[in-house]
Design a protein with these regions (language model features):
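Generic recognition of short, well-ordered alpha-helical segments
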Residues: 17-20, 49, 73
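Thiol-based oxidoreductase modules, predominantly thioredoxin-like and allied folds used
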Residues: 7-9, 31-47
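Non-catalytic, surface beta->alpha helical segment in thiol-disulfide oxidoreductase systems
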Residues: 63-89
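Local sequence-structure signature of Cys/Sec-based thiol-disulfide redox active-site neighborhoods
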Residues: 1-31
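Cysteine-centric redox/oxidoreductase cores and disulfide-bonded domains
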Residues: 21-23, 27-28, 56, 83-86
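Structural micro-motif
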Residues: 52-64
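Short alpha-helical
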Residues: 13-14, 45-46, 76
């Protein structure tokens, strides 16, 4: 199972939309059970430290194995991103 990190801002509609689309994609049979989603709030010290350690400075952002997906994305773009991560291994 791959560790997929989501960096978000809790009061941001863009972050909420991004997270909803990500959850929708992760529920598809193609991806179900293949990712462990970890959420970091960028308003917390832990979230900021984790983001800094991998070079992320904005939200919403998804990160897995060096691959980064930033900003509002379509459902298609999120699925494409997840497929590319799975193909890396």
């Amino acid at each position: 199972m791959k560790k997929l990190i989501l960096f978000y801002l809790p009061d941001c509609n863009v972050s909420k939309l991004f997270e909803e689309r990500l959850h929708k994609a992760l529920a598809l049979p193609e991806f179900a059970g293949r990712f462990n989603l970890i959420r970091y709030n960028l308003y917390t010290d832990t979230g900021r430290q984790e983001a800094k350690s991998i070079g992320v400075n904005d939200a919403p952002t998804a990160y897995c194995n060096g691959s980064v997906l930033r900003g509002v994305q379509s459902d298609y773009s999120i699925r494409k991103y997840l497929r590319s991560i799975l193909e890396q291994s």
